Swiss-Prot record:
Listed CDD domains: KPHMT-like
Phylogenetic lineage: Bacteria, Pseudomonadati, Thermodesulfobacteriota, Desulfuromonadia, Geobacterales
Provenance organism: Geobacter metallireducens (strain ATCC 53774 / DSM 7210 / GS-15)
Underlying gene: panB
Binding site for 3-methyl-2-oxobutanoate: D46, S47, D85, K115
Protein's name in the database: 3-methyl-2-oxobutanoate hydroxymethyltransferase
Cofactor remark from the record: Binds 1 Mg(2+) ion per subunit.
Cofactor(s) essential for the protein: Mg(2+)
InterPro entries noted in UniProt: Pantoate_hydroxy_MeTrfase, Pyrv/PenolPyrv_kinase-like_dom, Pyrv_kinase-like_dom_sf
EC number annotated for this UniProt entry: 2.1.2.11
GO terms, molecular function: 3-methyl-2-oxobutanoate hydroxymethyltransferase activity; magnesium ion binding
Length: 267
């Protein structure tokens, strides 16, 4: 597809049985490359706080940071659908804040949709944002903004009661108007059941192969996050080794006086 993707295109992919590909991006260069590769959706995740800014979790990320990174992504003019995360405290306090901050991500950042975490309890928030004509992608299961309540990054929905609650959450957010939902850190059979029962696309991350699409953090698939690699991450490259080699070679050549040579100098 040579034209810009929309939420309608993403939803049609589920109906057609075509898998949806999603990656995070936080800047211009990565966005340009992944868009040239044909990625379907780009997520400016609040994971930027961890993999880009070095925070321990996503909670410190601010609206201003999200807008900054969204602008950087949008400048690459990707054909992929651009979705921006709503960070912690940008939508939990009241509906007015939620609408205002969703609007900022679209108006000031250039996002085409927003993503927020939570199930049935955020249905009214989703509805309020959608009523402003801003598309919303939901996010249930392991929700990183809830790590203190969950006791860390733990798989959700293993017990029957939890499983039913997540299924109810999925149906509630669909009814509220979400155009898609991220399923994170849940058993693959539960993800399969939710995917079958929803008419909107499910995007899995640590949720098995039966979701309508998959999302991963770009730094994870490139091997740039040496400190922590979840079970569900597959590395498709070793950028850490490539960067280490390039930087080490640069340092060595400068120290030896080999760089710059005449070919990299002006006469």
């Amino acid at each position: 597809m040579n034209r810009k993707k929309t939420i309608i295109d993403i939803q049609k992919m589920k109906a057609a049985g075509e898998k949806i590909t999603v990656l995070t991006s936080y800047d211009y260069p990565f966005t340009r490359v992944m868009d040239e590769c044909g990625i379907d959706m780009i997520l400016i995740g609040d994971s930027v706080g961890v993999v880009f800014s070095g925070y321990d979790n996503t909670l410190p990320v601010t609206m201003d940071e999200m807008i900054y990174h969204t602008r950087a992504v949008v400048r690459a003019r990707p054909k992929a659908l651009v979705v921006a995360d709503m960070p912690f405290l940008s939508y939990q306090t009241d509906l007015r804040d939620a609408r205002l901050n969703a609007g900022r991500l679209v108006k000031d950042g250039g996002a085409e949709a927003v993503k927020l975490e939570g199930g049935s309890h955020v249905a009214d928030t989703i509805r309020a944002i959608v009523d402003m004509d801003i598309p919303v992608m939901a996010h249930i299961g392991l929700t990183p903004q809830s790590i203190h309540r969950m006791g860390g990054y733990k798989v959700q929905g293993k017990k029957e009661e939890q499983s039913q609650r997540l299924l109810d959450d999925a149906k509630a957010i669909e009814e509220a108007g979400a155009f898609a939902v991220v399923l994170e850190g849940i058993p693959l059979k539960l993800a399969e059941k939710i995917t079958e029962e929803l008419s909107i696309p499910t995007i899995g991350i640590g949720a098995g192969p039966h979701c309508d699409g998959q999302v991963l953090v770009i730094h994870d698939i490139l091997g740039l996050c040496e400190k922590y690699s979840p079970k569900f991450v597959k590395r498709y490259g070793d950028a850490n080794a490539l960067i280490t080699s390039a930087v080490s070679s640069y340092i060595a050549e400068v120290k030896k006086g080999e760089f710059p040579d005449e070919g990299h100098s002006f006469s």
